Amino acid sequence: MSLEIQSKAVVVDDDLVYLQTVGLMLKKLGFQDIKLFSNPIDALSYIETIQIDLIVSDWDMPLMTGCEFLEKIRKNPKTNSVPFILNTGNRSEAYWRQAITAGVTEFLFKPFSYSVFKDSVFIAIDLARYDRRHHNSISKLAC
């Protein structure tokens, strides 16, 4: 199964091997426009200029953690509903609890397989679509 729409994704990781690997996996899934960033500061600047369909980010990065990046994404009305997959090699329960509190859509532990990544991408996109439909339904009821 692959995406059949012009899907845009942003990938952020200071580990260039993971950055390239995740980019290739997204391409295989059908994403048409994939932008790779080695730090979240540059990614935030880019995200301000375009509508995107998915963000995949590492947690442990210099300048700003992936969770801090997620918090900034969720605070921005333009990006607060974008599916966000956060990944880390740290298996601390505190990490995933903090990510859930910040509004993560999916959480992956490194290393992960293509199959696990693929499932996470489709789950994240489906959850975001459901949330948007649910929000729109509630908005219509309120009118």
Predicted regions, residues:
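Alpha4 helix (beta4-alpha4-beta5 surface) of REC/receiver domains from two-component response regulators
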Residues: 23, 68, 91-106
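Receiver (REC) domain active-site loop signature in two-component systems and cognate sites
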Residues: 61
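C-terminal output helix
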Residues: 94, 112-121
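Acidic catalytic/metal-coordinating carboxylates
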Residues: 38-39, 65-71
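Acidic, metal-coordinating helix/loop segments flanking the phosphotransfer/catalytic sites
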Residues: 36-54
